[in-house]
Amino acid sequence: MKEPVYKRILLKLSGEALAGKQGTGINTATITQIAQDVAAAYKAGVQIGLVIGGGNIYRGVAASAEGMDRASADYMGMLATCINALALQDALEKQGVPTRVQTAIEMAEIAEPYIRRRAIRHLEKNRLVIFGAGTGNPFFTTDTAASLRAMEINAQVIMKATKVDGIYDKDPAKHADAKKFDKISYIDVLNRGLQVMDSTAISMCMDNKLPIITFDLTVPGNILKAVQGETIGTLVH
């Protein structure tokens, strides 16, 4: 087996990834497949921090667009990420991966509070850490939470697993002539307004020189390929 090129990564999963083809909620077969893929990377010797979105259950941005108070909507979205975190913890432990959930909003009965040094200690002890509740603040996306946590745990890379096989110059679902980038700079992503992550998350990565690899989660084995340094998806650097 190839040696991983990264010792510690931050894996960002969208909430929608857990929903499978049904589009909402949590699909058992889908979450099992994701857990198997994450477990393969873990068993290759990579320390993994994981940030999960909540869009399969609740989208704060969408609710605020319909007139709901944005802060309230965002807090509801944060709680949705915690539901996903617990589901993912269960799925990962079934694959033999020791997992801890830390949340940015305290909920002591179901998860640890987020404490940076404790998170790093878990990683050093080869436990996978799932970070729930985003940053704990409204108006910040889970992409921004991923950038923040990646820097806090000293991850070498953010791996953003999506439903698309990389970054294109326009939406490949709508444009047959869309061109895929193998590599692209942070500033190009911002200038072109490409929907990789929100601009806050990209700017944080740019300021701290943290590379982002975005790739297709729906292809089994892609997470392992990414940590082994195979060229998949798009590198933002």
UniProtKB/Swiss-Prot annotation:
EC class: transferase
GO molecular function terms attached to this record: ATP binding; UMP kinase activity
Gene3D superfamilies: Acetylglutamate kinase-like
Regulation: Allosterically activated by GTP. Inhibited by UTP.
GO biological process, one term: 'de novo' CTP biosynthetic process
Keywords, comma-separated and alphabetical: Allosteric enzyme, ATP-binding, Cytoplasm, Kinase, Nucleotide-binding, Pyrimidine biosynthesis, Transferase
Residue ranges of the TM segments: none
InterPro entries: AceGlu_kinase-like_sf, Asp/Glu/Uridylate_kinase, Uridylate_kinase, Uridylate_kinase_bac
Compartment annotation: Cytoplasm
Pfam name, any one: AA_kinase
GO cellular component: cytoplasm
Region (Involved in allosteric activation by GTP) residue spans: 20-25
Pathway: Pyrimidine metabolism; CTP biosynthesis via de novo pathway; UDP from UMP (UMPK route): step 1/1
Assigned EC number: 2.7.4.22
Record: residues binding UMP: G54, D74, T135, G136, N137, P138, F139, F140, T141, T142
Primary site of residence: cytoplasm
Reaction catalysis annotation: UMP + ATP = UDP + ADP
Entries under CDD domains matching the protein: AAK_UMPK-PyrH-Ec
Binding residues for ATP: K12, L13, S14, G15, G55, R59, T162, Y168, D171
Domain of life: Bacteria
Quaternary structure (record): Homohexamer.
Functional summary from the UniProt entry: Catalyzes the reversible phosphorylation of UMP to UDP.
Protein family per UniProt: Belongs to the UMP kinase family.
Protein name: Uridylate kinase
